């Protein structure tokens, strides 16, 4: 995808070799997250996945805050809510968790200060394709496909499925805007990643990225694809590998699975012992029992960690919505959900005013809120900022910078 300049190609601030440093930091963070899967000896650098983009974004933003185009004020109530809870928190690691929740917003603000040139946009498009190969190599090793030639029944690539959903949003949007079959093929490859990784929520989240993409696309095509997905899903459900993942006995029906999932997420009834929940149902019930004790305002930042460690020996409950509800209360959860919806609407409106294909960054950013909301039901996507949030909000921030540049160019044309 070759971009043409939409305004004068001003030099981008804080640069090294013509590349904005926030972009280098984001790329470094992605590599720090995925290279250890390919080369385990690099496991010690994984913490840079979220810290490097954050540190550079803060420095960059302090220097160029006057150029910020990202609508940070939309998120101001949520930022204040998290900051207040973090300052008052008694739980261990509350400060780190609070910072991680807000990191994507800082990254978005920093990227929105950049002056997008055609060279920069083409470079980002090219780098995403390069990262795709790193990602696929990590996926191949983590799932056993490249390391042993046989797919593992269980994998440690749940976070990879989260990244796959964001890449799927990129290629889905690119396909819808550009009509290139290569992008559709790459989307199909992304849709296959959670199948290979055997991550149940990931299969649903990634599959929905194309039919529910927020870029303009035929309603008929969306409907046909949505109609085909249950057929594909049913076929996958019957495979031995997924049956083993779903049921301890290795065999169950769709009705068994749907009933168990509904009961696990709503807490209305017990979950059948044969349904494999990876400990989620027990932890979810423990957290739900405490919701009424702090119904509106929650128990405080990161108070779920101690409960999760006691029950599952894992630091985070694999349900971000329940986590928010327990820690930040009903008001905090509704505040986050409402802000996410407002940001989606605001970004979608901005994307409609930008010519294609340079509106791809905004469309991808807002389309990614759907898989994010789905993953929040069974994972920690709001904390896995290195795997999802940083890149999503970087694209949003850059999209707003492009929208501002287009608007300024139109104003100059009207004035002349």
Residue ranges and their predicted role:
Residues 270-328, 348-352:
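Long extracytoplasmic/lumenal interhelical loops at the membrane interface
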Residues 38-47, 91-97, 152-160, 183-222, ...:
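Helix-loop-helix junctions and helix-breaking kinks within/between transmembrane helices
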Residues 327-373, 409:
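Hydrophobic transmembrane alpha-helices and their immediate junctions
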Residues 364-375, 380-416:
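Transmembrane alpha-helices of multi-pass inner-membrane enzymes
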Residues 116-147, 154-217:
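Alpha-helical transmembrane segments of multi-pass inner-membrane proteins
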Residues 49-53, 72-114, 127-132, 157-162:
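Aromatic-anchored transmembrane helix interface
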Residues 1-84, 113-122, 126, 174-181, ...:
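Transmembrane signal-anchor hairpin modules in multi-pass inner-membrane enzymes, especially those
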Residues 196, 217-271, 288-293:
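A membrane-periplasm/extracellular boundary helix in multi-pass inner-membrane enzymes
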